[in-house]
Amino acid sequence: MLFGISYYRKKILKVSTVNEKLRYKVPSNLNLSLQNLIITKILRRGKYLILFFRDSKLCLLIHLGMTGYFRLSDELVEKKHDHVIFFLKKKILIFNDIRKFGFIKIYCDKEIFFSSHLINMGVEPLGTNFNLNYFNSFRKRTVDLKGLLMNQSFIAGLGNIYCSEILFDARLSPLRKINSLNNLEIRNIVKSTKKILKKAISFGGTTIKNFIVSEEKIGYFKNKLKVYSRDKKNCLRCSKGILIKKIRQSGRSTFFCEKCQK
């Protein structure tokens, strides 16, 4: 998350690559391409960030991966796992990623939304396009509910933690098939999705292991989780003795209550 960068739309004086071996190799021409450009606009699409520049047809596509983050500093103090350093006017912007699943790519601004990363991406969960009518266009599918919510071509940016929390809030089982849902249940999914995401944003996201927000702050929504990572603990909605269950779906952990999520 690039909280804070929008306030520092400064000229890039130079870019230094400390380690090029991220998910994709850092472009060798990164410094040459970006030197003296001014950041003018920052967009988010799903889990991707896009940086645009004044008087340039180039843009940057950035993915933070599992553990990546940016930090702004007044002076260069390098830390372990720093990979790319952007020297701005009066500020230094540093990309750090412990697991190196993140990446930085250069694209032409007219091609970026047609890139393999973005072209098939679904609607934004907080946008008006995510609604009953949109959901109904997928309603004949026989996939399970959580699987659809995790599908980036259906809805952009939802991760494993939030899917479990959304379905708990909507009182729906992650195992339900899409073609079994009625209109009321779909409306509840849409409503719960927007509710949980807005609440998570207000708490700065969710820090489980390594995730931090800019300026190296953690996300406090971890303290508000009602089902995720609470397996074998009492359901916060049901009576005592009803425990949260953990299962595996498509290789990912899912947490839910068998009693109140139907």
Question: For the regions a protein language model found, what residue spans apply to each?
Answer:
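A cross-family signal for N-terminal binding/gating loops and helix N-caps
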Residues: M1-I104, V227-Y228, K233-R237, S250-K262
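Short coil/turn segments at secondary-structure boundaries
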Residues: L13-S16, G147-S153, T206-I212
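Phosphate/anion-contacting hairpin/loop surfaces
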Residues: F53-G157, Y162-D169, K177, L184
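A feature for loop-to-transmembrane-helix boundaries and adjacent hydrophobic helices
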Residues: N136, S164, R171-L175, N234, ...
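Short conserved catalytic/interaction loops centered on acidic-Pro-aromatic/His motifs
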Residues: S173-E185, S202-K209
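Basic, amphipathic alpha-helical segments enriched in Lys/Arg and hydrophobic/aromatic residues
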Residues: E185-S202
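C-terminal accessory segment of soluble enzyme catalytic cores
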Residues: I201-K262
